[in-house]
Structures are given as C-alpha cells and as structure tokens.
Amino acid sequence: MNYSDYFTNRPTDEITRDLVGRPLIYDNGKEKIGGYIVEAEAYMGKNDRTAHSYGGHRSPANEGLYRRGGTIYIYAQRQYFFFDVACQEENEPQGVLIRAIEPIWGIDTMIKNRSGKSGVLLTNGPAKMMQAFGIHDKNWNLHFLSDSPFKIDLEDDHRKPAQEIIADKRVGINQSDPVWANKKLRYYVAGNPYVSDMKKRNYAKNNGWA
C-alpha cells in the first residue's frame, strides 16, 4: 500500500491505531535510525477543539495539515519539535502525532543526540523522539513522506504485534473543553515503557509485545 492510500481511505483515528507497532525510520545521511511506534494521537480537524486546524484555522505554520494525506507536518513549541503526518484528502486538515517509539535501529546515535540519555528517556515523548533523531528544525515540513528521509513501513508482516492497544485521552489537552479533552484518541501499546508517562509499576512483560 502506498502512503496516499494509507493516510486517506479510512477515519483518522483508525489510521492512528493502525500505526502502532509499525517501524518509523529516519535516514540521517549516515545511517538509518528509529524504532517501532508505540504511541500516537489522532487530531480530527476543523471540529476538534484541540487541533491546530480547529475552526478551519489556516496559516503558514499549520499548512502541512491541509496538504494531502501522507504529508509531513512538523511544528515547534519553544525549542522543541514534533512530527505529525497529515491524514485525509487535501484541505481536510486532520493528522496524527507520533508521540513515542521503542528504539531499535541506531540506538548509539540516538543516545548521543540526546546528550547521553538512554533507556526509556531516550524516546518516550514526541520532542524526545525528534531530539533522538537529531532534528532541530522544520526543514522536512510539507514534504511528502516518500520524498523525505522518513519512512513508515506499511508492510503488515513488518508490524510488531502488541498484546493490547489501549485507546485513552490525549496528553496535555486543555480541560476547559471536557468533550474533546476526554475523547480517547491516543493509542499506545499497553505496558510499553517507552509510552510517555508510563508508570514503572505498569510495565508489561516483553514491553507489551505479543
């Protein structure tokens, strides 16, 4: 399946859930680094009060969401960067935020990029993941995935099966809007230690993989 079909032919929350367990790989020009996606959040577009495109808001900063599904949308908050992929057809501004990966490839390089931080602290959050990749800018914003150094492996036999995928509330959502704050649009591998804010007491055997 190609990226255009994968990121357009079903609801964004279904796409987000299906991404869990798939390899996300970044080619930094010297080596390929990355891991299995263990946590991702869906943002449902113009009606989602937590989305950057809520109410049809459109600006150069969030233009990536308005591009065709499979387009990279990188945004910044202070000095931190976040990796999203647009979903649905052009001008239907929905997307998925990749929140965390379990690192597999290029771990030594990722530790160096994270100034020596290792273990679960390496990639257990969206900004940490981007730091681990060595990304400190928006150079790849608005690029289509297949025209970038990023790859999400869509081969089903390369997807790592989880024992359970949890649907839960998204992280850091403003509680002043209880409807959207409580929608279960975050998907993660149950008990995986690389999921953001996963408590050690909840760590699962084999990191939650089947």
From Swiss-Prot:
GO molecular function: alkylbase DNA N-glycosylase activity; DNA binding
Protein's recorded name: Putative 3-methyladenine DNA glycosylase
InterPro entries: Formyl_transferase-like_C_sf, MPG, MPG_sf
Entries under Gene3D superfamilies matching the protein: Methylpurine-DNA glycosylase (MPG) (3.10.300.10)
EC number(s) stated in the UniProt entry for this protein: 3.2.2.-
Classification via NCBIfam families: 3mg
Keyword annotations: DNA damage, DNA repair, Hydrolase
Family in the record: Belongs to the DNA glycosylase MPG family.
Keyword Nucleotide-binding applies: no
GO annotation, biological process: base-excision repair
HAMAP family: 3MGH (MF_00527)
Record-linked CDD domains: AAG
Domain of life: Bacteria
